[in-house]
């Protein structure tokens, strides 16, 4: 069991039960999965670009990404149906906790001019979305081997019923929300 998972069970669960008045431990919200998506628009012209994005994402997540493909052909964007345009990874259980721990304690503090993540990016159902502009904030990525700076979307899917519960859960887990 890693550091964040232990902290969730020993500190977060009792604190959430007290704050929201849950009667049962199973009512306490938890992170169900974390989805990391990297859209690579240039992949339509140069498929090699997608390979480097896949390798970057694999290094960051510690799990092999799956390619995301275009659902429909769009002439204005010069894309055809089933053309590979990005990659994504769904992390659960141990990998998920390791990634969230790494993101909160190492990667986010390395962002330039970092003042906290937006507290408004909840979807109304207790899920949180976070956009990152460059993959270089992760310690596993070597600056010299990066061909192009790419961003990614990170989605935290929680079992919380409201945004307030999800915000408190992520705050207890160390997510630095902007004031």
Curated annotation (Swiss-Prot):
Keyword match Ribosomal protein: yes
Tell me yes or no: is rRNA-binding among this UniProt entry's keywords: yes
Q: Which UniProt keywords apply?
A: Ribonucleoprotein, Ribosomal protein, RNA-binding, rRNA-binding, tRNA-binding
Q: Which GO terms describe its biological process?
A: translation
Cited Gene3D superfamilies: 3.30.1440.10
Which SUPFAM superfamilies does the annotation name?
Answer: RL5-like
Q: One cellular component GO annotation, for this chain's record? A: ribonucleoprotein complex
What PROSITE patterns does this protein's entry cite?
RIBOSOMAL_L5
Could you give a GO molecular-function term held by this entry? rRNA binding
Q: Which residues form a coiled coil?
A: none
Per UniProt, subunit arrangement is: Part of the 50S ribosomal subunit; part of the 5S rRNA/L5/L18/L25 subcomplex. Contacts the 5S rRNA and the P site tRNA. Forms a bridge to the 30S subunit in the 70S ribosome.
Database matches in HAMAP family: Ribosomal_uL5_B
Q: Which family does it belong to?
A: Belongs to the universal ribosomal protein uL5 family.
Described by its record, this protein's role is as follows: This is one of the proteins that bind and probably mediate the attachment of the 5S RNA into the large ribosomal subunit, where it forms part of the central protuberance. In the 70S ribosome it contacts protein S13 of the 30S subunit (bridge B1b), connecting the 2 subunits; this bridge is implicated in subunit movement. Contacts the P site tRNA; the 5S rRNA and some of its associated proteins might help stabilize positioning of ribosome-bound tRNAs.
From the Swiss-Prot or TrEMBL record, give the protein name.
Large ribosomal subunit protein uL5
Q: Which organism is it from?
A: Clostridium perfringens (strain 13 / Type A)
State the encoding gene. rplE
């Amino acid at each position: 069991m890693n550091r964040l998972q232990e902290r969730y069970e020993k500190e977060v669960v009792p604190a959430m039960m007290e704050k929201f008045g849950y009667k049962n431990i199973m009512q306490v919200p938890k992170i169900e999965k974390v989805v990391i998506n990297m859209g690579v628009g240039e992949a339509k012209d140069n498929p090699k670009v997608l390979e480097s994005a896949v390798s970057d994402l694999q290094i960051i997540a510690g799990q092999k990404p799956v390619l995301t493909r275009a659902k429909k052909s769009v002439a204005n964007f010069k894309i055809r149906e089933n053309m590979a345009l990005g990659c994504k990874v769904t992390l659960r259980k141990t990998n998920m906790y390791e990634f969230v721990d790494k993101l909160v304690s190492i990667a986010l503090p390395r962002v330039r001019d970092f003042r906290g993540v937006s507290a408004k990016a909840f979807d109304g159902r207790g899920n949180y979305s976070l956009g990152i502009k460059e993959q270089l904030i992760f310690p596993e990525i070597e600056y010299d081997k990066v061909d192009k700076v790419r961003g990614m979307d990170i989605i935290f899917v929680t079992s919380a019923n409201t945004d307030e519960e999800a915000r408190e859960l992520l705050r207890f887990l160390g997510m630095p929300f902007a004031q």
